[in-house]
Amino acid sequence: MPKSEATEATGSKSGPDLLEGGNNPLFFNCHEFLVTKYRELGEEVVREHTEDEALCITHFPNIYCPQGSVEFDRTRIVRLPRRFEESMHYPSFSTELPGHEPAALQREDEARFTPAGFHDGHVFGRSSLSPLSNYVSPEECRDVVRAINGYLKEAYRVQGTQNILFNALDVLTFYTVSLLLSYFRRRTQLEQLEDYVEEVNERFFEKRGIRIISPRRSAYLSLDIQIPRPVPPAARS
């Protein structure tokens, strides 16, 4: 598996063994992958590189806007993966900023996303640090995702008192109670989650040029964050 091989390689990249102490597997972002055939910054030719020089693909096409649109060309998606340690019964996302996971590919001289080469027309670095690290701190990421996970846990808790009561009433009234309560009761946890995501975007993220995509749009398979398309240093200056 390329990820584990790169993690164990010696040189500029470093990372722990994927099996901590030989027993417990370490977590890494399952969405990222490595490529060894790419064009380095400042070069014109695509060539093969060693695994230790591989680019780490950490951002992806924005599937939430029409392909070929201006927004599609100017934005990318960073994905925070699902985690299953706490429960298999409700969605839960990684609270780690991509590049800070226990088994992430790291470079000692990098604290933020550092472009190294081009692949498929986009710029990538050689570590697991995604461009999101240029906009959000690890602490901010952790706080926001923990709140999102909290809403999801409550929404999918089948043994909660409210769920048990509503299910019993629905059976007895042929779902009439749910139809009536939908007009009067407070918003559901999933609706509150949508409100929270919108609030975070409006108050904090949109001024930085990024935004959280509603988890509902990804079917809760990943927590997707839209970022500006990364550009090489020469294009920024």
UniProtKB/Swiss-Prot annotation:
Question: Which Pfam families would you find in this protein's record?
Answer: Erf4 (PF10256)
The record's subcellular location field reads: Endoplasmic reticulum membrane
Its Gene Ontology molecular function terms? palmitoyltransferase activity
Report whether Isomerase shows up as a keyword of the record. no
GO CC entries: endoplasmic reticulum membrane; endoplasmic reticulum palmitoyltransferase complex
Its membrane topology: Peripheral membrane protein
- Signal peptide (from-to): none
Q: Which UniProt keywords apply?
A: Endoplasmic reticulum, Membrane
In terms of InterPro entries, this protein maps to: Golgin_A_7/ERF4, Ras_palmitoyltransferase
A GO BP annotation = protein targeting to membrane
What does the record note on quaternary structure?
Interacts with ERF2.
Give the family this protein belongs to, as stated in its UniProt record: Belongs to the ERF4 family.
Recorded hits in PANTHER family, A to Z, give: GOLGI AUTOANTIGEN, GOLGIN SUBFAMILY A, 7, GOLGIN SUBFAMILY A MEMBER 7_ERF4 DOMAIN-CONTAINING PROTEIN
What does it do? The ERF2-ERF4 complex is a palmitoyltransferase specific for Ras proteins. Palmitoylates RAS2, which is required for its proper plasma membrane localization.
Supply the name of the protein: Ras modification protein ERF4
Origin organism of this chain? Answer: Eremothecium gossypii (strain ATCC 10895 / CBS 109.51 / FGSC 9923 / NRRL Y-1056) (Yeast)
